[in-house]
Amino acid sequence: LPVFEAKDHFLFYPIQYEGQECSKNIFYSGAAPNQQAEPAVDWLLKNKGKDFFLVGSDYVYPRTANTIMKEQLKANGGKVVGEDYLPLGNTEVAPIIAKIKQALPKGGVIVNTLNGDSNVAFFKQMKAAGITPANGYSIMSFSIAEEEIAAIGPEYLEGTYAAWNFFQSLDTPASKTFTKAFKAKYGDKRVTNDPAE
């Protein structure tokens, strides 16, 4: 941020962000927590349970979003029973899986702000450990769309939830037009997602 302001250059920032800064040199088009995380937590509280485990990649967005969600949960009768972070790209998820099992032995809500390859290992190992919707776990992810589903494998995500501002499978005229134009330009096998929208 200081570099763009000092040089008076412009940055387009298309992914979700913390929402706690503003600059005339940055155009944020991604969701802030009040547009993604907070509505998802409201829905989870009303429909899925009160005991939450927060897991995320270890950088500013997951930590800030989780701080906001903890306050929201506290104010609305929810409870954080655990919280843990992985360095970006880390696939050593077994310790986190063990913590989830210990904190939520009979099921509960898991909010996932992991990114990248961490999600592949996370969902595969969660299924192997029996942490699935069929066993009473509601899992909400904030950085998973069609491309990530293909990388992880849909069989590992069945019954889980994702909250993002755009999915190419969204059944609206605008989504269909955008996705068709995107595929015409970049190829039919390419997948668009929230940041690309």
Question: How does the language model describe each region?
Answer:
Residues 1-13, 19-21, 126-135, 155, ...:
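Extracytoplasmic "Venus flytrap"/periplasmic binding protein-like
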Residues 8-9, 78, 188:
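Short glycine/serine/threonine/alanine-rich loop segments
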Residues 1, 12-14, 51-56, 106-116, ...:
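Periplasmic-binding protein-like
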Residues 18-19, 24-129, 169-177:
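Extracellular/periplasmic Venus flytrap/periplasmic-binding protein
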Residues 5, 45, 98-101, 150, ...:
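Alpha-helix boundary recognition
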Residues 13-14, 30-31, 164:
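Pocket-edge structural micro-motifs
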